[in-house]
């Protein structure tokens, strides 16, 4: 983009966001007169100042450049009655769950609804385990929305049912690219980070990580040990989506992500804080501020007194609007199966079709007619034919009346 196009787009954004020249100039560390000359095309732009202006204008975006999600939720219930948990806590109809005679973490079986997993065991010390990973959280939000429940309500239901927290991930998503992951890595390596964490790992987008670490996430920084009960992870979400789904990097809504990953007791205390204050920003950033602070070097002072880096200060709350716990409901669809079909199977199907035409055979037709649907395929068809509302169990147990 040349300077003329950039300046015109900048002017339009500034007016759309309701930002005065003076306010933007102050944020960029220049005078209003200097900025005015830039916007009129009378002052040439160098790459460094252009980058500063691009970053600062997005901080005024009224569409909230940062938002916070629950991205992993795992809780164990002290009961062997999985169906009761499905009906009373998830408030879903078991008829829409797929039963599978295998599970994870030592559980013998599980009930599945899309990416919502309920692990089952007849051993009382294992009980029933609800696991919601990223997609599972988004799908659960569809049901919570239809039930007119919030995450806070759902967590309270889990705790009321005797739930024991096993894992909770809070994800702060950066839509404007303000959280510069490569820069954070450089500052950490340069010793410009005040932290209680003893361990740190960083990966470039081409490195293969261990089994406990996600792959293909662009530049990645881990703060704390991944085997501990609390650690943090910052990575380039747009690169991850490009590798996983082929989404163009510039078209990805979320540019960067900062995650707080908590297990067991740490997860429990985070949930208690969320339920006490119902303020996800307070919970998330009190944890972040306790454990880590990125600073700018001041060699004439002790490290603990170094000034907080401007970008980091904005990220943790200085001079920005508060962020709330939001939801991004995404119903389960056949898209994953269709994507696999398109990439892995469609070329072979097309080849067999051509072979049938050439030889006047019906190989493909015969194969489809002879194929038998497995339970998981029937389950997918059941989900496609039903609505979110139809899967909800509206009969709230009598003992829960009045809680909400």
Predicted regions and their residues:
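N-terminal flexible/basic segments that precede or flank functional cores
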Residues: 1, 42, 52-54
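Structured, helix-rich domain cores that form ligand/interaction pockets
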Residues: 3-4, 12, 16, 58-332, ...
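Short basic helix-loop element that most often maps to the first helix and adjoining turn
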Residues: 8-27, 52, 327
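Conserved hydrophobic/aromatic packing and binding residues within compact polymer-binding modules
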Residues: 10, 24-25, 35-38, 334
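Short coil turns linking two alpha-helices in DNA-binding domains
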Residues: 20, 31-34, 330
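Recognition helix of helix-turn-helix/homeodomain-like DNA-binding domains
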Residues: 29-45
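DNA major-groove recognition helix of helix-turn-helix/homeodomain DNA-binding modules
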Residues: 46-62
